[in-house]
Curated annotation (Swiss-Prot):
This is 3-phosphoshikimate 1-carboxyvinyltransferase. The keyword Amino-acid biosynthesis applies. InterPro entries: Enolpyruvate_Tfrase_dom, Enolpyruvate_Tfrase_sf, EPSP_synthase, EPSP_synthase_CS, RNA3'P_cycl/enolpyr_Trfase_a/b. Its EC number is 2.5.1.19. GO terms for molecular function: 3-phosphoshikimate 1-carboxyvinyltransferase activity.
Amino acid sequence: MSDALPATFDVIVHPARELRGELRAQPSKNYTTRYLLAAALAEGETRVVGVATSEDAEAMLRCLRDWGAGVELVGDDAVIRGFGARPQAGVTLNPGNAGAVARFLMGVAALTSGTTFVTDYPDSLGKRPQGDLLEALERLGAWVSSNDGRLPISVSGPVRGGTVEVSAERSSQYASALMFLGPLLPDGLELRLTGDIKSHAPLRQTLDTLSDFGVRATASDDLRRISIPGGQKYRPGRVLVPGDYPGSAAILTAAALLPGEVRLSNLREHDLQGEKEAVNVLREMGADIVREGDTLTVRGGRPLHAVTRDGDSFTDAVQALTAAAAFAEGDTTWENVATLRLKECDRISDTRAELERLGLRARETADSLSVTGSAHLAGGITADGHGDHRMIMLLTLLGLRADAPLRITGAHHIRKSYPQFFAHLEALGARFEYAEATA
């Protein structure tokens, strides 16, 4: 890790008077993992410029290296010497707690004569369902072994391709996994997505990645039909990772909640990350956000008001935006966010519990979360980070506006997606203490 913090720690968030300064948005976690995998599936050398330093990125690099790819870190870049369509067989891969990494690699594992997936996070990734992807791989002819659709999992090919259905009800990552596999199969892949498709934006990011590496693929407007011709090759070269909107949503929200002025650069205006919508949500709530090219300027401290929004397209920003809702006038509701229950924690029930612990009013349904805003938050207690990086972001933002310091347990889990989160906020004027972890 690039930070100098202990391996495990709690964070004590001190109330902030204002936030002021300039930051460059961290590289996108979603694009980093996709670009690294595509680079490994190419034959030859690819330079991925400006990779994220998150635990997910490290998990992908570690697994690709174990599978036989050459990996060299040069400054902020990763130079990958790919294995093409021939990852090593007989390898056990441990993606840690990185669900997307695990699923993407499970799809590609059908190119091998046997790959096993394990995790040292049995109570998190180990409990997350993979059955929809495994069933699709079996229908393509792969051999699969699992613990009732959960890790440990073994996958082995060969498969030729063809037409296959995959459910997108729980996650879009299952379809993305098959999309990475498709171009390297002799017969290609005709994907039919079933169920209520969750998170269209990540699917478009995968299509974007395939295009960046010279792979031909077409999709219907509703993404229910995706066609990928077979016998293709990923083209090596040089790709630049864009800025990360999910993590930046937390910085933008913090800047909106407190007086001051914050400029955040490296956020493309025409970007496929669904969490870009967080900018519009904050504006709708009353935040003063101005865009100049790839830079957003937030003039904070304005009164915010509640909104009701379908959060399906920006699920990874819902936690950060919930901090804005906590101080907005009225009742804010995030609808159609059932997939939040399948993350590192249950981001609906656990969020409701933490908000109530802090004295706020919150309600949940099977697929929604509602928050009643309050002008003040007492703080002065210990909140549970639930081992979830997005929950830690939410609680940190609440602590910045609280009347007294707020302690968050297990704050080291922020490293999963945003290792520099606390350092970036400190650069804007926030103050934190780091204590021995209690959970």
